[in-house]
Amino acid sequence: MDKVFILGGLRSYIGVRNSAYRHVPAEHLGAAVLKELTARYQPSKIDMIICGNCVGGGGNITRLMALEAGLSESIPSVTVDLQCASSLEAVITAAARIQSGLADLRCV
């Protein structure tokens, strides 16, 4: 099995009730994170984007984030919605795909 390394980490603001970001759609918050990550790493090396989101209104919010961040339409995007465990499951999914040889670089 391939070894998996976390190359860096960023987090979006939390748009909860009474916060300054409560009216900002989640895809805008996520797109800001993706833009910064792709400024640090080569976007052409990313073979999939996996994002955990527990307050989405349905649909593939990760796809919206990727497109808004200016990433290629050819990069598949997956949204994981497991209340309270979405982000951890996104990391586990990415790591498992890398270990199995199905992927090289995942943006989570």
Model feature map: region roles:
Residues 53-104:
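Conserved catalytic cysteine-centered active-site region
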Residues 1-75:
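Conserved "HGTGT" condensation-loop signature of ketosynthase/thiolase-family condensing enzymes
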Residues 3, 104-105:
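Residues that mark the start of a beta-strand
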